[in-house]
Amino acid sequence: MSSREISNAMSGISNQTAKDILKSEYPTIYNAYKDIADEQFELFAKKHLDYGMGNISAGTQLVNEGEINFAMTGLWYRLSDKINRWKNMIITNRKAQNESLIDTFQDITNYGIISQIVYKDLWKEN
C-alpha cells in the first residue's frame, strides 16, 4: 500500500462514490432504486414516443424564457394533479379506480425529471 493510500485510509478518504457505498451498505435499496429507475426510463421513452415533443413544449419552440415558463407551468399543473390524487387517496383511504398508486408515483417522478430537462433547456430533438 502506498503512503497516499495509507494516508487516505487513515483519514477516511476513499475513491468510492456515494453509489458504491450505498451498494455495499444497502444492497436491497440500491437494487430496488436501480430497477425502478430503469422502469421509469422505459415508461418515459414509451410515452415520449407516443406524445412527441409538443406535449411538453405546449406547441412552443422553447426558445425564450416566456415559452419555457409556459411549459414549466404546464408541468406544474400535471404534477399538482398527480400530487392531489395521491393526497386524496391517502385522506379518503380509497383504493384507486383507474390508475394504481404506483402509476401516480411514476408520473410524479417522470414529470419531475422532464421538468429538470426543460429547466436546463435540454428539451430538444438533437
Where would I find each of the regions flagged by the language model?
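Intrinsically disordered, low-complexity regulatory regions
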Residues: M1-N126
